[in-house]
Amino acid sequence: DRSVSRGLGDVYKRQLLFRPLPKHLNQSVIENALDPAKDVDCMTDGSMSGVFTGKNVGFPPCTPQACMEILDHYGIDCTGKKAVVVGRSLVVGKPAAMMLIKKNATVTVCHTRTVDMPSVVKEADIVIVAAGRAGVVDDTYLREGQVVIDVGINVNEEGKLCGDVDFEKAEPIVEAITPVPGGVGSVTTSVFCLLYTSDA
């Protein structure tokens, strides 16, 4: 309810919606009751529109922003590079693609209907994988010289955390790859803390 959002507006400098919500609640209504200027995880339609239009409406989504921070930290210039994002969710895939475009990369988004995905991914200089399936990207997708950012967080058959990229097969081939755990997830937490406390 927007009245709840307005009522909290003067009290709280930042707003974060914890999910999943109870099933009886309408997630879209609740997300859009947040104030875009205080929505630290880009849940509102207004916040997300800022990502797609290039206008600074509220805050960027934390996980795609973490991917950009990793590229920046290691001095990886995206200008003119071919980038592939595996996954088209509104949480990671689509916003990550838009952020890469803003960095002047030439971006392709792969998804479950992509034909010959390994060949498409192999052409990329930068690969962001947010497919939501453990080890879906293996050595057949990759080549030397690539930078791979693995956003996935899964539990394998042994009960261990793993990413969407088969790390053991990928790591010897590519130039650089983020591990799971200890990669994007850790940076996402740092990005969230930075956004949550900025100008608060």
Q: Where do the protein language model's features map onto the residues?
A:
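Short acidic/histidine-rich motifs immediately flanking catalytic phosphotransfer sites
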Residues: 10-13, 123-125
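Anion-binding alpha/beta catalytic cores of soluble intermediary-metabolism enzymes, centered on
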Residues: 14-82
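Generic secondary-structure signature for well-ordered alpha-helical cores
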Residues: 35-39, 48, 72-77, 101, ...
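Glycine-rich phosphate/diphosphate-binding loop of Rossmann-like nucleotide-binding domains
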Residues: 61-137
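Short amphipathic alpha-helical face segments that pack within enzyme cores
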Residues: 66-69, 187-195
